[in-house]
């Protein structure tokens, strides 16, 4: 008798009720950002490799033994994971006039994906489209990045916390038309539009409008926490809006399991919606569409005691 049968059966039922996709996925993607391959490399993610579809291997510099990079890449690819260096490396290569060497490096090491971004603001849209085509012609899967980290020179934004929906959609569609397989929507924009405390109602409306204008199989929402702000509420907000198979990127390796729990509605975010829906399915067609609490109850905005209910 398989003593793990009950766990497998429960897991299968959770996947079914959440309509969760399996690898190789075209939607429901989780991309993991590796900024420390020595401590959070292949061995760390191996136990839950089925949850990870792509890796952004940011950590390419300042290693005592540079072979760690090639070994990690080989291990990731054997797990069925697409691997790209960070868009940072593309911008460095471009700034130093070394794109041809960069392409050779990617091929020699076995990267199968590249990210085209323009945080330095030195490229026109036409140049970005040409770069997408160049890397596609070289046999890479290509992801184009939408927007920039800082709003002051980002043509898709009108302020730190709001965008031009029209210009954002236009940029995304141009990158897709040029051949980009996916679009990463810059994480600082996604965070600003949702609001670190889920407070930016106008920005949320804009984010939904953009998402509804782009093929959901193409757009991947980046999230990152470089300012040490929590990501879990933002994961939950995106899953509530777009379902468990929303594409998410820049997930830290230690957050992958928590994200998967949120994708299945079995954690505190949104007040354990799967439990509530399982008990009373008249609440909605699926657990992520049922009523959720007002996050003012939980998130610490100028924390003070609240009146009792």
Feature map (PLM): residue ranges:
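Conserved N-terminal beta1-alpha1 strand-loop-helix module at the mouth
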Residues: 2-73
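C-terminal alpha-helical cap/extension of soluble enzyme domains
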Residues: 3-19, 211-309
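Active-site mouth loops of central-metabolism enzymes
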Residues: 25-40, 58-63, 84-98, 121, ...
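Hydrophobic faces of well-ordered beta-strands that scaffold small-molecule active sites
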Residues: 27-35, 53-57, 83-87, 114-116, ...
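Generic structural signal for hydrophobic
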Residues: 44-48, 76, 105-109, 135, ...
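A structural motif
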Residues: 52, 111, 177-181, 216, ...
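Catalytic cores of alpha/beta
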Residues: 97-104, 166-176, 227-242
């Amino acid at each position: 008798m398989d003593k793990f049968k009950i766990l497998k059966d429960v897991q299968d039922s959770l996947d079914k009720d959440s309509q969760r996709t399996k690898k190789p996925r075209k939607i429901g993607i989780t991309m993991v950002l590796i900024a420390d391959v020595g401590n959070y490399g292949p061995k760390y993610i191996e136990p839950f490799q089925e949850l990870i579809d792509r890796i952004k291997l940011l950590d390419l510099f300042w290693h005592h033994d540079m072979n760690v990079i090639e070994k990690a890449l080989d291990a990731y690819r054997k797990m069925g994971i697409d691997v790209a260096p960070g868009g940072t490396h593309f911008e460095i290569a471009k700034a130093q006039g070394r794109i041809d060497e960069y392409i050779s490096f990617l091929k020699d090491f076995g990267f199968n994906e590249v990210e085209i971004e323009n945080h330095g603001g030195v490229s026109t849209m036409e140049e970005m489209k040409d770069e997408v085509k160049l890397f596609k012609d070289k046999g890479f899967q290509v992801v184009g990045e939408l927007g920039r980290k800082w709003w002051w020179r980002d043509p898709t934004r009108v302020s730190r916390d709001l965008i031009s929906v029209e210009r954002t959609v236009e940029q995304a569609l141009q990158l897709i038309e040029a051949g980009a397989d996916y679009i990463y929507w810059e994480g600082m924009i996604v965070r600003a539009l949702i609001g670190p405390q889920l407070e930016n109602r106008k920005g949320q409306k804009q984010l939904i409008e953009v998402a509804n204008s782009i093929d959901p199989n193409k757009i991947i929402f980046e999230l990152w926490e470089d300012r040490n702000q929590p990501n879990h509420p933002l994961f939950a907000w995106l899953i509530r809006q777009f379902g468990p198979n929303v594409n998410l990127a820049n997930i830290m390796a230690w957050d992958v399991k928590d994200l998967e729990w949120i994708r299945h509605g079995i954690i505190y975010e949104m007040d354990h919606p799967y439990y509530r829906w399982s008990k009373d399915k008249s609440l909605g067609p699926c657990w992520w569409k049922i009523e959720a609490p007002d996050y003012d109850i939980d998130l610490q905005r100028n924390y003070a005691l609240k009146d009792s209910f």
